């Protein structure tokens, strides 16, 4: 499903590479964890796979293939089709990733609105199911709340729901339990 071949990423404002020679393969249904010290390139590798790094600020070499489709040098329009539909991402800082002016429900539903022709009520029901799967209490009530009205752990769960709502092939998790309570982690 996912193949990374000799990935190198260097930011223009840094002396050394953020990622140096990463190669890995992930098959359907497989779970792989990247472990390393802070600054070792785990997040940059994940962001490269998701197509979320600013291309004008870094140089890439190598290949990233999702079901044989090249992602590293793909057009932004191709990446937009893949992001959310085939790749879901959960970041460690949900406060910086959620739109503070948009209620939680529409944010969880957003990938369905963009990538499917699903009717609004069906999108809403799918979002509620994803929120329940992420162990959000009272998903219906949380849909009408803004990000600032939720705790860090609740917001992290909402972000997990948004990442899984469209049932992506690949789920990238960058320290997804950082904001969760110890009992949930």
Please report, for each region that a protein language model flagged, where it lies by residue:
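Conserved ABC ATPase "signature" region
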Residues: 70, 122-141
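Hydrophobic anchor residue at the start of the ABC signature
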Residues: 108, 160, 184
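Conserved ABC transporter NBD signature motif
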Residues: 58-70
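Conserved ABC ATPase signature
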Residues: 145-150, 154
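A short, proline-enriched helix->beta-strand linker immediately N-terminal to the Walker B motif
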Residues: 165-169
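The feature captures the beta-strand-to-loop junction immediately N-terminal to the Walker
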Residues: 35-36
């Amino acid at each position: 499903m996912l193949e990374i071949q000799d990935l190198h990423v260097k930011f223009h404002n840094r002396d050394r590479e953020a990622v140096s020679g990463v190669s890995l393969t992930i098959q359907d249904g497989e779970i792989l964890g990247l472990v390393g010290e802070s600054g070792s390139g785990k997040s940059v590798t994940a962001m490269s796979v998701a197509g979320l790094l600013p291309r004008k600020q870094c140089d890439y070499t190598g290949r990233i293939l999702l079901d044989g489709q090249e992602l590293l040098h793909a057009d932004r329009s191709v990446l937009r089709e893949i992001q959310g539909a085939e790749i879901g991402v959960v970041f460690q800082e949900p406060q910086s990733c959620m739109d503070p002016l948009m209620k939680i429900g529409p944010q969880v539903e957003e990938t369905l609105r963009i990538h499917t022709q699903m009717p609004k009520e069906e999108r809403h029901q799918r979002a509620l199911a994803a929120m329940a799967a992420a162990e959000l209490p009272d998903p219906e009530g949380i849909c009408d709340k803004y990000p600032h009205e939720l705790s860090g752990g609740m917001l992290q769960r909402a972000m997990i729901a948004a990442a899984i709502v469209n049932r992506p092939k690949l789920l990238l998790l960058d320290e997804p339990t950082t904001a969760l309570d110890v009992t949930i982690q």
